[in-house]
Amino acid sequence: MSYFRTPQTHPGPLPSGQGGAASPGLSLGLCSPVEPVVVASGGTGPLSQKAEQVAPAAQAWGPALAMPQARGCPGGTSWETLRKEYSRNCHKFPHVRQLESLGWDNGYSRSRAPDLGGPSRPRPLMLCGLSPRVLPVPSEAVGKEASSQPDICILTLAMMIAGIPTVPVPGVREEDLIWAAQAFMMAHPEPEGAVEGARWEQAHAHTASGKMPLVRSKRGQPPGSCL
């Protein structure tokens, strides 16, 4: 069964004596250059004249008019071709599709790509998709930064109590360390408390004069030894 546009869309039969040169208005508005036109067998009426004039009109206007995607016509084969090509490109670049789904620009991702694996840099928000307020901060990092200075002070105090030479701690005075060590020794006395008290008094006297003595431990360890 042949199919064609209804005759009501045409103002009248197309003249056959134009030599194949149809007007632009007829080729664009009334019929499509690539529209299949089937003429009934044995017909010599207006349908055969239309079939004779459609092909020369498409050739006169060039290949741009003959392409359905150039004119915006929803041709089945053209959209199918575009869909296959788009799906092939998406399978070829899966990370681009992931960035588009997250709403990030491709240029931004390329500029921030070298910073993804840096240990000293915070992880960018491009991969997780969270704002800085929503992103949780690890508690280990906060606790380490907050307790780093007290750990050093406690370690220095323990070394002084054990009689191990210490190095100056930034932000901590030597007088405070000696006072803390004396307070600790008073709170935890030992059998030879008198000897220890005399030793700490001698150390305090040297500190007041501007010299930090090298106090030997009770176990007879040399001044430069470690725990």
Curated annotation (Swiss-Prot):
InterPro entries: SPATA25
Region (Disordered): 1-23, 204-227
A GO biological process held by the record: cell differentiation
Membrane topology label: Single-pass membrane protein
Tissues of expression: Expressed predominantly in testis (at protein level). Expression is lower in patients with obstructive azoospermia than in fertile controls and is not detected in patients with non-obstructive azoospermia.
Domain of life: Eukaryota
Pfam families (alphabetical): SPATA25 (PF15218)
Keyword check for Transferase: no
Chain segments annotated as transmembrane: 152-172
Listed PANTHER family: SPERMATOGENESIS-ASSOCIATED PROTEIN 25 (PTHR36857:SF1)
Name of the featured protein: Spermatogenesis-associated protein 25
Annotated organism of origin: Homo sapiens (Human)
Gene name in the database record: SPATA25
